[in-house]
Each structure stands twice: as C-alpha cells, then as structure tokens.
A protein has these predicted regions:
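Active-site-facing substrate-recognition patch
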Residues: 1-62
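Short glycine-rich phosphate-binding loop at a beta-alpha junction
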Residues: 62-72, 149-151
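Short acidic, glycine/proline-enriched helix-loop-strand junctions
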Residues: 61, 76-91, 163-178
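Short helix-loop-beta connector
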Residues: 59-64, 114-117
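PRPP-dependent phosphoribosyltransferase catalytic core
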Residues: 2-12, 138-186
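Short, glycine/charge-rich flexible loops or terminal/linker lids adjacent to PRPP-binding catalytic cores
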Residues: 77-121, 129-134
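Solvent-exposed alpha-helices and their adjacent loops that cap or buttress functional pockets
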Residues: 27, 111-117, 143, 163-164
Length: 186
C-alpha cells in the first residue's frame, strides 16, 4: 500500500509540483526547474498522501510532535497530525516561524511542543542545501527538544541531505530528484 501511495504521490508531484523555467532557489542557487510542492500538499489527495507517507515513517518511533519551518512544512505537519489521529496514534504539530514575532507572545514556535526533552520530527517539502531545515532544527533544539527524525517529501540531492547526515540527523526522503529534475522513489 505504501509503495502505491508513494507512486501516486510521485505522479502528483510530476503533474502539479514540477515547473520548468529559470528560477532562483531559497539557497540562492539557479535552476531550470522548481518544485512547488504546495500545489500538491494543499490539494485534498496530496495532503492525505503526504500525511500518510510521513506518518508511516514516524509511526512507533516515540515521536512527541512533528513540525517544520513555515510555509513549506505547514500543510505537511497538519496532514501528519490528522492522519496520526485517524490511526489512533496522535502526533501533534508545530510550526517554526521564519522570523521572530514582535508582538503578542513573540514565539519562535507555534503549536505543540510538550516539554523540554521532547522527541520531535522535522519535515520539509523540498530539501536543496538544507538551510530551511537546519533553521527549524536550531529553533527546536534551542527550545530543548531532541530531533529524532528529519523527513523531506523531495530531496534535490544538492547537499542538504548529506549535510544533515553529516551532522548526525536521521534523514529520509519520500522522493528524489536528479540534476535534470527527473523524479524517482529511490
């Protein structure tokens, strides 16, 4: 079942999330293709599949909460929380702000992180160099949490996943892209 869901998710990314053209990525790198996975994760089926695929990786790992840097992680963490509830194994969600809020509670993290020492998973829509992921990791570690797992929906294989592993994080990608933007499940 998970393989069928991964294949369907890959089809959706190819159909809705892959855009060809000239782009500057968040890392500053230039690219002839761009993955706009919000076009997938904000659809009903895509949200379900993303939530299901990530939840299946986190199930039975003792994860206390799942989160990531806004905006790419937002629909993913909500989908994981929903799927986990449907499975009777609720994993609450949190979102790491890109910039510190200067009014109200001035929180760097919104949502649920239970306490210092919590075991959390960080999710990302697309990982390139890893800057956004590392920013989220830094915020949750500064809040006293342990990062037990890092999951990206798609790895562009441009150094980010290698850097996370080099730093000792347990990283998994659902899909992979090569230098030409071709997507695979391996």
């Amino acid at each position: 079942m998970m393989l069928e869901q991964r294949e369907r998710f890959m089809e959706m990314v190819k159909e809705r999330g892959l855009v060809r053209g000239d782009f500057t990525l968040a890392s500053g790198a230039k690219s002839t293709y761009f993955f706009d996975l919000k076009m997938v994760t904000l659809s009903a089926e895509g949200a379900y599949l993303a939530g299901r695929l990530v939840f299946d990786l986190l199930r039975d790992r003792g994860i206390d909460a799942v989160g990531g840097l806004t905006l790419g992680a937002d629909p993913i963490v909500a989908a994981v929380a929903l799927v986990s509830h449907m499975e009777g194994k609720p994993i609450p969600a949190f979102i790491v702000r890109g910039e510190m809020k200067e009014h109200g509670t001035q929180k760097a993290i919104e949502g649920y992180i239970s306490q210092r020492g919590s075991s959390v998973a960080i999710v990302e829509d697309v990982i390139t160099k890893g800057g956004s992921t590392l920013k989220a990791i830094k915020a949750v570690e500064e809040a006293g949490c342990q990062v037990a797992k890092v999951v990206a929906l798609l790895d562009r294989h441009q150094g980010g996943s290698d850097e996370l592993r080099r730093r000792g994080y347990d990283f998994t990608a659902i899909l992979h892209a090569d230098a030409a933007g071709e997507i695979s499940t391996e």
